[in-house]
């Protein structure tokens, strides 16, 4: 089947004093060995830092594909070897070991590897910045470490303050949006973003899965951006990041352009305007 990964599937819990990292017995701690680095491409902005061994660092990376709170997160470390694809690990965002924390339960462990061959855990929709940030104001100021736990193991990335790195990330995102022909400041003032007319989970169907990839058990994770015009029609599909065979990219854009329909974005006074819709889809077999 196709599992559509959407940000509203994962519940957000407010920062609460539940120090599970401090109570854990089997903990691997990864200290930073490089500064944070922001990288700008023509499709996304990334924020990454090396941890562990300086000669061969593990990686904590965030990637953003549009304005707002959605982030893709990636962890690479052979300390994650205890994870299996069938697991449902928990991501823990915390303020030191004994301070407040909140958890994000993943529906599955999306595992892979980067060119360095280390175990890689993909988190398509990190809840570092929740959709309703009322109970977690300025999360990038508060959170100092990010961990993953399952099977009695905990791996902790001692990230430090994220305030300045994410300031740079937001500046990068503004510059990227300008290359799409849009004004980031005007987008912030929208009274409404494009609203899907039908559930996005229905835009891609089980019978869209490519036959060969299904037979081989191949899976994919695709981040896309649709430009949506004043009439609510998708006019362009851009693959912003893909951990997949190209066939998944092709099918994703073809089907979305054919099936996705929107109520258009509205400016401050309610006039329809062009904007974009950015999301991610996981192609998985079960």
Listing of model-derived features with the role each one plays in the protein:
Residues 9-17:
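Bacterial N-terminal signal peptides
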Residues 74-110:
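Extended low-complexity, serine/threonine- and proline-enriched intrinsically disordered segments
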Residues 101-203:
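Internal interaction segment
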Residues 188-227, 250-286:
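Short proline/glycine- and basic residue-enriched helix-capping loop/turn segments at helix->loop/beta transitions
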Residues 211, 241-247:
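A short acidic/small-residue loop/turn micro-motif
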């Amino acid at each position: 089947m196709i599992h559509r990964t959407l940000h509203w599937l994962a519940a957000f819990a407010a920062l609460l004093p539940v120090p599970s990292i401090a109570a854990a017995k089997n903990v691997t701690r990864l200290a930073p060995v490089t500064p944070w680095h922001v990288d700008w491409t023509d499709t996304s902005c990334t924020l990454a830092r090396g941890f562990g061994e300086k000669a061969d660092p593990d990686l904590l990376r965030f990637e953003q594909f549009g304005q707002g709170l959605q982030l893709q997160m990636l962890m690479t470390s052979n300390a994650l070897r205890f994870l299996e694809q069938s697991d449902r690990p928990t991501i823990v965002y915390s303020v030191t070991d004994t301070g407040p924390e909140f958890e994000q339960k993943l529906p599955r462990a999306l595992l892979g590897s980067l060119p360095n061959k280390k175990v890689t855990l993909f988190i398509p929709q990190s809840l570092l910045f929740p959709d309703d940030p009322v109970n977690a104001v300025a999360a990038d100021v508060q959170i100092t470490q990010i961990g993953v736990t399952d099977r009695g193991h905990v791996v902790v990335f001692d990230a430090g303050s994220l305030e300045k790195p994410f300031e740079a990330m937001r500046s990068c995102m503004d510059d990227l949006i300008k290359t799409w022909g849009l004004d980031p400041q005007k987008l912030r003032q929208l009274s409404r973003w494009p609203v899907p007319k039908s559930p996005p989970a229905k835009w891609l169907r089980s019978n869209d899965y490519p036959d060969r990839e299904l037979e081989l058990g191949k899976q994919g994770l695709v981040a896309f951006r649709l430009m949506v015009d004043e009439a609510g029609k998708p006019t362009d599909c851009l693959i912003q990041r893909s951990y997949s065979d190209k066939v998944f990219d092709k099918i994703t854009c073809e089907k979305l352009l054919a099936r996705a329909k929107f109520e258009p974005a509205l400016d401050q006074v309610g006039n329809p305007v062009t904007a974009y819709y950015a999301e991610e889809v996981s192609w998985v077999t079960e």
